[in-house]
């Protein structure tokens, strides 16, 4: 029987209707976060899709030293707490160091381990100590079966609820590809698997001083992943992605999200029919 992770009234499992994890790449301020959350709560309620809000207080791995990193942990968590209380939605955000885990866990329901840090044992252990759900993004440099080692570490540290995320694999320079087999391979570890449709179209460092991306392929990859069968769909969105402070070329335009989700629900239903 496939593992099911429970978060409030949300059930996350590879055989269950997909959960949507979405929000802007980074926190840009309280007003923007509340604006985005309100739009996303209304949309997901209308479409009856379980929703988890995601946004980052720090983009610690920006390509350039001049890249905008975010509002920082103190202000960021204050804003995420406001989103959580005002819209009664669970929160996921990423942690980049052991020192951030305890403080972040006071607000976030899920701690996300960035792909570049997925093998950092001390970070995994610190996240585990919070007792929160731990969501690990598979490194672009890892085979899907290598995530067994990450799972073993987390379980050794006492984590009961683990989520894995596929976000593409390095394919030459400045390019990623998505191997849809990895979704099934990681699911065989009895861990709910999430597909990151927006970071999978990244072109890391492709713009020289920043990361490029091919937004036009987000829907295509999302359909493919949903056809395989996933526990969650991860998509970063923005009302004006071309002017967003980070990952603009990858993020979905908010106005286009509803039509894509309607299609994904159909794919998901067919895939999971008994």
UniProtKB/Swiss-Prot annotation:
Keywords for this protein: Cytoplasm, Lipopolysaccharide biosynthesis, Transferase
Does Cytoplasm count among this protein's keywords?
Answer: yes
Enzyme Commission number(s): 2.5.1.55
Q: In which pathway does it act?
A: Carbohydrate biosynthesis; 3-deoxy-D-manno-octulosonate biosynthesis; 3-deoxy-D-manno-octulosonate from D-ribulose 5-phosphate: step 2/3
The record's section on Pfam families has:
DAHP_synth_1 (PF00793)
Question: What Gene3D superfamilies does the record tag this protein with?
Answer: Aldolase class I
**Which BP terms in the Gene Ontology apply to this protein?**
keto-3-deoxy-D-manno-octulosonic acid biosynthetic process
What superkingdom heads the lineage? Answer: Bacteria
Q: Name one GO molecular function term.
A: 3-deoxy-8-phosphooctulonate synthase activity
Instruction: Read off the HAMAP family from this record.
Output: KDO8P_synth
Family under the similarity heading:
Belongs to the KdsA family.
Name this protein carries in UniProt: 2-dehydro-3-deoxyphosphooctonate aldolase
Q: What is the source species?
A: Rickettsia africae (strain ESF-5)
Source taxonomy lineage? Bacteria, Pseudomonadati, Pseudomonadota, Alphaproteobacteria, Rickettsiales
């Amino acid at each position: 029987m496939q593992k099911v992770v429970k978060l409030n009234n949300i059930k996350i499992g590879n055989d269950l209707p997909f959960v949507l994890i979405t929000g802007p790449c980074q926190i840009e301020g309280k007003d923007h976060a509340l604006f985005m959350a309100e739009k996303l709560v209304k949309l997901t309620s209308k479409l009856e899709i379980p929703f988890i809000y995601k946004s980052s207080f720090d983009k610690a791995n920006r390509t350039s030293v001049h890249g905008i990193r975010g509002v920082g942990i103190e202000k960021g968590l204050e804003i995420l707490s406001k989103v959580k209380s005002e819209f009664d939605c669970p929160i996921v955000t990423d942690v980049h160091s052991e020192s951030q885990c305890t403080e972040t866990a006071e607000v976030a329901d899920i701690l996300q381990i960035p792909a570049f840090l997925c093998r950092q044992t001390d970070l995994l252990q610190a996240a585990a100590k919070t007792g929160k759900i731990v969501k690990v993004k598979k490194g672009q440099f890892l085979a899907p079966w290598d995530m067994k080692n990450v799972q073993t570490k987390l379980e050794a540290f006492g984590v009961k609820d683990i989520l894995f995320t596929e976000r593409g694999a390095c394919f030459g320079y400045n390019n990623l590809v998505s191997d849809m087999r990895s979704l099934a391979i990681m699911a065989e570890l009895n861990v709910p698997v999430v597909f990151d449709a927006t970071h999978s179209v990244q072109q890391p460092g492709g713009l020289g001083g920043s990361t490029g991306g091919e937004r036009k392929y987000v829907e295509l990859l999302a359909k493919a992943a949903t056809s395989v069968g996933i526990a969650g769909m991860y998509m970063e969105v923005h009302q004006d992605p071309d002017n967003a402070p980070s990952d603009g070329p990858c993020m979905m335009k908010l106005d286009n999200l509803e039509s894509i989700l309607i299609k994904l629900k159909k794919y998901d239903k067919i895939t999971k029919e008994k």
